[in-house]
Amino acid sequence: MEVVKGRGYVYSIQYHIVWCVKYRRDVLNGQVAIKLKELLPQISKDNGFQILEMTIEEDHIRMLINCTPQHYIPNIIKAMKGVSARLLMKEFGDDLRSKLWGGHLWNPSYFVATVSENTEEQIIEYIRSQKRK
């Protein structure tokens, strides 16, 4: 767990985040999953946080992120879900709309938990082990 020094403060902030496809449909596969693996790191870079670990399942995403004290978790989620949905719908819209309805890719809810120095390795191993065989 990396401790970062800012101007007037020292921090180490990690979150374990999970969110699902609307209706838990299996749509995050093939070219959609490949594109999503490219998009999410770019979105994190554009918004100033870092994805430390990530797995993309057919119906949900798990990740461990590192961010600064200035980040607000709902804004991080909004950026990742909003930008990725817009770009995936633009590129794969017909295929996605055939499996989803209402024009929504992501379920509006999400799971987030803070990560401590004691649990970071456990969460990384958990995220890695959740890949479907």
Give residue spans per PLM region.
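Basic nucleic-acid-binding interfaces
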Residues: 1-133
